[in-house]
């Protein structure tokens, strides 16, 4: 599959929309994750209420795939708890590795199915989810 098939219009639209881009005033959890192989960097911040995401912001320095994945998170993560985000993260890996269709109620994840077979790009999509999980762990009470 060519780069033009991976970076299709839906990916470009999600990356451009940048849903959730910004910073929170007083986040409960924050994580910064880098991919040294490609230079992508994601900073994710969360606020929680009763164990569920009540606020979320991200800053991404990365490729279209990384920015699009962060935008999907910005669009869908509100109201989710850590276990739900973990399931979505596993689903993302299955979409990339096994070309399984999205089933979590996050239909936008299907836009990443053309990335299947391009292993060097998997982490670009997964990085925002890793950052969100790390931010949720940082927000969890000790």
Give the location of each predicted region.
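Functionally engaged cysteine thiol sites
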Residues: 38, 63, 124
């Amino acid at each position: 599959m060519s780069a033009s098939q991976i970076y299709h219009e839906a990916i470009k639209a999600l990356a451009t929309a940048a849903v959730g881009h910004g910073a929170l005033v007083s986040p409960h959890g924050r994580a910064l994750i880098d991919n040294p192989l490609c230079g992508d960097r994601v900073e994710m911040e969360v606020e929680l209420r009763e164990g569920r995401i009540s606020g979320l912001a991200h800053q991404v320095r990365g490729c279209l795939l990384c920015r699009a994945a962060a935008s999907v998170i910005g669009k869908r993560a509100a109201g989710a708890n850590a276990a739900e985000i973990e399931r979505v993260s596993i689903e993302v890996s299955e979409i990339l590795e096994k070309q399984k269709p999205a089933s979590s109620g996050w239909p936008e994840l299907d836009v990443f199915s053309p990335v299947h077979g391009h292993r060097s790009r998997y982490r670009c999509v997964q990085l925002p989810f890793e950052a969100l999980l790390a931010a949720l762990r940082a927000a969890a009470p000790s």
